[in-house]
Amino acid sequence: EMCIRDSTYPKPIICWGHGIVMGGGLGVMAGCSHRVVTEATRIAMPEVTIALFPDVGGSWFLNHMPGKSGQFLAITGASINAADAVFTGLADRFIGSEHKATVLEQLRRSAWSDDSAVNHARVRHILRPLTEQSIGSMPGGQVEPHLTVINALCDGDDVHQVVDNIVNQQTSDQWLSRARDGLAHGSPLAALWISRQLQETRHSSLREVFQAELMLATNVVRYPEFAEGVRALLLDKDRNPAWAYKTTREVPAELLEQFFQAPWATNPLGEL
């Protein structure tokens, strides 16, 4: 509900995405009207490693990324930086972190209006010159230069072939290698429900996305795969999860289907 309010709130909301921006933090940032990233920004949706899925609106913003980059980032959990965030639409501006105090001071000094459009314009007026001053310090991105490869890897007859393409790729590229390994070590079952969720919400509204994510999350957390992922990564930290299936092809179709069946008569977010 908060994320929906953020995305429709009339007043400007500035999110300063400095450092690690993952999980719920990324969902909050995605709904803000003025999203700023810095040279230290690190973004990822690594839910495949704990047998979850990119929620808090991930089904929306991943489906709106260029080419197949959203699907690739979702099933591999690959990490991206500020340049990637701007390219994929997760952020609106890159501003060097040294300008944060200037931004705050100018916001304090601004004469705000009762007109929401005027206030948004004033925020842009403050951020724009600092964006221009920061161009030279923006790090090189990974998604845009790799987009052709990403699109080819994700161009499979089905999700199993896409997974095979990524896991079996032979590459010396460090970023692609880490993405490959993320999927290879992640939950095969999670890779399936992540891909299915993205497919089913391709043409959904933002409200419909949150309703669908709540349903999937409720079903996922009740299944032992999620508990095993949390145990291996966050509790025992042995990074050796005993996944229920070794490959996506071993997962019974009827099992996957269960995660997409509503566990209630009425969705708790039905009145969004």
Q: What does each model-identified segment do?
A:
Residues M2-I4:
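Short, small-residue-biased leader/transition segments that mark boundaries at the very start
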Residues S7-I50, F72-L73, G77-A78, A82:
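Glycine-rich beta-to-alpha active-site loop
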Residues V28-M29, D84-A85, I194, L233:
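Hydrophobic/aromatic residues within transmembrane alpha-helices
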Residues C32-D55, G89-L104:
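Gly/Pro- and small hydrophobic-enriched strand-loop and loop-to-helix capping segments
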Residues G57, H64-H120:
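Contiguous mid-protein beta-loop-alpha structural module that forms a pocket-lining wall or clamp
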Residues G96-L183:
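Amphipathic alpha-helical blocks and their helix-capping loop/short-beta junctions
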Residues V159-Q170, W175-M215, V221, E225-A227, ...:
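Substrate-recognition/cap regions that form aromatic- and gly/pro-loop-enriched pockets
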Residues L216-N219, P224, E228-L272:
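C-terminal amphipathic alpha-helical interaction region
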